[in-house]
Amino acid sequence: MQETSIKRAGASAAASAAPAATVPATASASARKLYIRTFGCQMNEYDSDKMADVLRGDQGLELTDNPEDADVILFNTCSVREKAQEKVFSDLGRVQHLKKLNPDLVIGVGGCVASQEGEAIVKRAPYVDVVFGPQTLHRLPELIRRRRASGASQVDISFPEIEKFDALPPPRIEGATAFVSIMEGCSKYCSFCVVPYTRGEEVSRPFDDVLVEVADLADQGVKEVTLLGQNVNAYRGPMGDTGEIADFATLLEYVHEIPGIERIRYTTSHPKEMTQRMVDAYANLPKLVSFLHLPVQAGSDRVLAAMKRGYTTLEFKSVVRRLRAARPGLTLSSDFIVGFPGETEEDFDKTMKLIEDVGFDTSFSFIYSRRPGTPAADLVDDTPQEVKLRRLQQLQALINAQAAAIAQAMVGTRQRLLVEGPSRRDPNELMGRTENNRIVNFPAPARLIGQMVDVIITDAYPNSLRARVADVDGLAQGNA
């Protein structure tokens, strides 16, 4: 689970493998203030930015780093892991005392835990003022007004489908990267997953709406967009009044033609719906980056069937082979669950073999966590915790070794970066990201921020690379 205190309104597109960025707030001392803490995935980060946009536009709230300064405190939650759920209630307890210091303080809980728990949150934490789901964040101003008018906690965890996108204000951009949500929900109903129950069924944004948003972002200087959805391959966007439906490959083709957009990323995808048209996109669309997050979850067909993933290991490998034939050098990240109910040592060995055969640059790997209301919750969780921990450590060690080998192979190569801002390691240096999602730190002047720059990789580290500028308008190599 990732978590971050959101301190900005514009979304910089962080990699799925990277921790969320922390950017200082710029609120004036006199402005009413908003504090948002975000748990979980990139969709939640996107939603948190939208919460900030909505409340800034309607109530003039500006973001703050400090919950003690806030007039509104929001927790945007994740229910994928059990500990993440409990973490929310722990953090709620830490801000409860602020109500005594500021009786007008509004405390809200949004996201997937809110969608799953609803009224139960208020029963467990009666000082919570508003509870809202991922599909109702645009109603936050009205929920807050109702709370202040009535004195009663407000709960809205409905699924109003496309209404959210129609109601959200235009994004305020800071930087050359941005998230664009193209759909919500998931209809796959994997046996372990709560997403269909917390975010609803798959609902796609209209095709033209997505293109207009991306074009507007490009006009504001955005060069890289990350298209977001729980399962972007399932995108089926209505094309105006034509009665036609655009699939995800079609959307990518049109986004690719928008002037000013130089890179396209997307997450998350489902192996079952990686169509040949999607594979062909990697051969035909050079702006589509050479990096793909493709969750496999396990390498045992028996476990995959129990998870209701809808594919076999051979089918997954076939998808990977076709992708790499279309785009040589494509790197992959993935998701893995160890200790799924009934997973044997043989099943786990098959997962390790899959990793060895395919090769991954990074992964989100977890010990299975029982989620109430899912089909897998009824299965017997019969793997001892120490065995789960050992398997997780083995799996992560193998993927770390593969990632290190990929990084080392990049030393001496020329890479094209989008420069995102100052380096976190050294504010006198810059940080950019390669096509395959590697963070690169290098000395260069600040005027390069937001630009595409060629560098030569000089060193590889566990979580980043180091480089020197190859050539920028006569800039001396390695010169800051």
From Swiss-Prot:
Residues 408-471 form the TRAM domain. It catalyses: N(6)-dimethylallyladenosine(37) in tRNA + (sulfur carrier)-SH + AH2 + 2 S-adenosyl-L-methionine = 2-methylsulfanyl-N(6)-dimethylallyladenosine(37) in tRNA + (sulfur carrier)-H + 5'-deoxyadenosine + L-methionine + A + S-adenosyl-L-homocysteine + 2 H(+). It holds the Pfam family UPF0004. It comes from the Bacteria. Its EC number is 2.8.4.3. Keywords: 4Fe-4S, Cytoplasm, Iron, Iron-sulfur, Metal-binding, S-adenosyl-L-methionine, Transferase, tRNA processing. The keyword Cell inner membrane does not apply. Residues 32-149 form the MTTase N-terminal domain. NCBIfam families: miaB-methiolase (TIGR01574), MiaB/RimO family radical SAM methylthiotransferase (TIGR00089). Belongs to the methylthiotransferase family. MiaB subfamily. This is tRNA-2-methylthio-N(6)-dimethylallyladenosine synthase. The gene is miaB.
